C-alpha cells in the first residue's frame, strides 16, 4: 500500500474498484483553512481517459507492479500503435490514446520499453532523451545569442519545442522526454 502523499508523476496504482490509474501530475495543496490535500491529474490506463481529483495525504492505494520489456516501435495505423518485443519478437497493439504522449518522442523503429500489468500491455516508456530533426522553425537571426528568449520549432514527430534562436531547419536536437524541452544540438 502507498499513501497519496507519496504518489508522484509516472507511478501507477490500483483503486478499490479495480481501476488501474497512472499519475500524470501530483502536487500538495494547503488551503488557508483545513488540512493539506493532494491534487492530481490522473489517467485511467485501460480507457485512456484523464481526470483531475483530490485525495487526503493519508489515503492508501495498492501500488501496481509494472514489468517492462525491451521493444521497438513499428508503426501506427488508425487508432492503434504497433510494437515488437525485441527478445521474443511478439507484436503488441496498444491504443494510441494510451501512448499519445510517448508517440511525440519516437519514430518508427525506435527502441522503447513496453509496460505490462500481469499479462496486460498498458503502455510504453521512452528513453529520457531522444534525438529528433527540426522540420520547421523561423529563420535564424544574425547575431542571435544563447541567452535569447528562443523560438518554437516543429520536430519530425510533430512535437513543438522552444529552442534557441540559432537553431535551423534540418538540425538534429536532443530533447528531454520527461519535460518536452530542448537540451542541446546532437
Curated annotation (Swiss-Prot):
Example GO BP: peptide biosynthetic process
Pfam families noted in UniProt: EFP (PF01132), EFP_N (PF08207), Elong-fact-P_C (PF09285)
This protein's pathway: Protein biosynthesis; polypeptide chain elongation
Gene3D superfamilies, A to Z: 2.30.30.30, Nucleic acid-binding proteins
Sample GO molecular function, one term: translation elongation factor activity
Record's keyword annotation contains Cell inner membrane: no
The UniProt record lists the keyword Protein biosynthesis: yes
Domain of life: Bacteria
Keywords: Cytoplasm, Elongation factor, Protein biosynthesis
Entries under PROSITE patterns matching the protein: EFP
Coiled coil, from the record: none
GO cellular component entries: cytoplasm
Localization in the cell: Cytoplasm
SMART domains on file: EFP, Elong-fact-P_C
Function comment: Involved in peptide bond synthesis. Stimulates efficient translation and peptide-bond synthesis on native or reconstituted 70S ribosomes in vitro. Probably functions indirectly by altering the affinity of the ribosome for aminoacyl-tRNA, thus increasing their reactivity as acceptors for peptidyl transferase.
Assigned protein family: Belongs to the elongation factor P family.
NCBIfam families: efp, PRK00529.1
Protein name stated in the entry: Elongation factor P
Organism the protein comes from: Streptococcus gordonii (strain Challis / ATCC 35105 / BCRC 15272 / CH1 / DL1 / V288)
Lineage of the organism: Bacteria, Bacillati, Bacillota, Bacilli, Lactobacillales
Name of the encoding gene: efp
Amino acid at each position: 500500500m502507498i499513501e497519496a502523499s507519496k504518489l508522484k508523476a509516472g507511478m501507477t496504482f490500483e483503486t478499490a474498484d479495480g481501476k488501474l490509474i497512472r499519475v500524470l501530475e501530483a502536487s500538495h495543496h494547503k488551503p488557508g483553512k483545513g488540512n493539506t490535500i493532494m491534487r492530481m491529474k490522473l489517467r485511467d490506463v485501460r480507457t485512456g481517459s484523464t481526470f483531475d481529483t483530490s485525495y487526503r495525504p493519508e489515503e492508501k492505494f495498492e501500488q501496481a507492479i509494472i514489468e517492462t520489456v525491451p521493444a521497438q516501435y513499428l508503426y501506427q495505423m488508425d487508432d492503434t500503435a504497433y510494437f515488437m518485443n525485441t527478445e521474443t519478437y511478439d507484436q503488441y497493439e496498444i491504443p494510441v490514446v494510451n501512448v499519445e504522449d510517448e508517440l511525440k518522442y519516437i519514430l518508427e523503429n525506435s527502441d522503447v520499453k513496453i509496460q505490462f500489468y500481469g499479462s496486460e500491455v498498458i503502455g510504453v516508456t521512452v528513453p529520457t532523451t531522444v534525438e529528433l530533426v527540426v522540420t520547421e522553425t523561423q529563420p535564424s537571426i544574425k547575431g542571435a545569442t544563447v541567452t535569447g528568449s528562443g523560438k518554437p520549432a516543429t520536430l519530425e514527430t510533430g512535437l513543438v519545442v522552444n529552442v534557441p534562436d540559432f537553431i535551423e531547419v534540418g538540425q538534429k536536437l536532443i530533447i528531454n522526454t520527461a519535460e518536452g524541452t530542448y537540451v542541446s544540438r546532437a
